[in-house]
Amino acid sequence: MKVYAVGGAIRDTLMGLPVNDVDYVVVGSSVEEMVAQGFRPVGKDFPVFLHPETQAEYALARTERKTGKGYKGFHFYADPTVSLEEDLERRDLTINAMAQEVGPDGKWIGPIIDPYNGQEDLAAKVFRHVSDAFAEDPLRLLRIARFAARFPEFSVADETLFALKAIVQSGELSALSAERIWQELARGLVAHKPMHMFQVLLNTGAANTILPSTLSALLVEESFREGLIKSLEIAGNSLDERCAIVLMDLPASEIRSWADTIRMPIEVRDFSEIFSDLRVLINQYPDGSYQAADVLAWFNRADLWRKPDRVQMLLNLAQKLGLPVSALILAMRKAQSLNTADIIAGVEAQDRSNGERIGGAFESARLAAITAAINLDL
């Protein structure tokens, strides 16, 4: 029985990057032996165990065979006779198919085991798939796209690009779960260069399947891509902000439809939708001479009265992008400064239990405050 650290931990160590998680593979052991040594089985589809002390995950070396559609359509075979090289062969990229033995004290020992020339591709900064089985797993396309965003200095090998296109042409992308699509896209969005992820989706033909149709069409235009790169660089690495920037040229209805399809978290979806509505409002009044009723409608849509921090984030993002929102910021502050007690006191005593009358009084007061702010800004 031998234990090896494998995959991303080896890659990141060789690149001089911090290692947060380590995947361990056990060669020459069985389920019975692992349990006897105190490991707790947790894997549903293949033998994975938690270390009795560190709780780190250890997987038995395994091979796989395609039996159905999608990234779950595989039959795994784990046995003491499966070698480390056979286990590494099923991995996606050569740079992720390296290993190093782990000694009894937990320290990595001996040379890097690199049967598929991962170190060579790492030095050349190339994403190259390990074997022909690569094209059997559609999730790998999204992983490569995400890796491209994380490691923008890398290029995709020609033969790997061909394999990625084969995944798209096979129709296997339709078998991916909505949750996994969002998970990979979200990780790519907050990576170093998100545009590289979208470029992979474009180059492979996957954009039309994975992304909203309007966004896919826009990404074909070089001017849009250049503008998107600049906007993403201006914004921080907040997922909410980056997602909103990518989707800001789409109508809110299309954002909602796509977000629901890929199970985007509600708070991220709402932020993107409301920012899209803000863009519409700004474009409607390019000279900044807003109509108070339209501004109030957006404040209500953004739920300023219960979520002021979110509205502040939206306006701050617009300001960072150079959009004319000074009047809106002033209007927000004026509307927020209204005294609730004074508004209620202005309602006839007999109507103060009438929710509709109270609501109308607040709308009128807010509208007046916004009007004053807009006139002050002009």
Q: Which residues are covered by each model-predicted region?
A:
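Catalytic cores of the polymerase beta-like nucleotidyltransferase superfamily
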Residues: 1-378
